[in-house]
Swiss-Prot record:
It is found in: Cytoplasm; Nucleus. GO terms for biological process: red, far-red light phototransduction. Component of the CSN complex, probably composed of CSN1, CSN2, CSN3, CSN4, CSN5 (CSN5A or CSN5B), CSN6 (CSN6A or CSN6B), CSN7 and CSN8. Belongs to the CSN2 family. The keyword Cytoplasm applies. Component of the COP9 signalosome complex (CSN), a complex involved in various cellular and developmental processes such as photomorphogenesis and auxin and jasmonate responses. The CSN complex is an essential regulator of the ubiquitin (Ubl) conjugation pathway by mediating the deneddylation of the cullin subunits of SCF-type E3 ligase complexes, leading to decrease the Ubl ligase activity of SCF. It is involved in repression of photomorphogenesis in darkness by regulating the activity of COP1-containing Ubl ligase complexes. The keyword Cytoplasm applies. Keywords: Cytoplasm, Developmental protein, Nucleus, Phytochrome signaling pathway, Signalosome. One of its GO terms (cellular component) is COP9 signalosome. This is COP9 signalosome complex subunit 2. The gene is CSN2. Its main location: cytoplasm.
Amino acid sequence: KSAVTRNYSEKKNERLWFKKNYDHAGNQRRIQKWNTQLK
């Protein structure tokens, strides 16, 4: 049971990590777009 719970929480953390990095990459692209529009 504890192994299953640990595995589940690891997967959850993995998803959160991917989401965070994906959002960060999206923010970087938006910032670059704004910068090029401002120039």
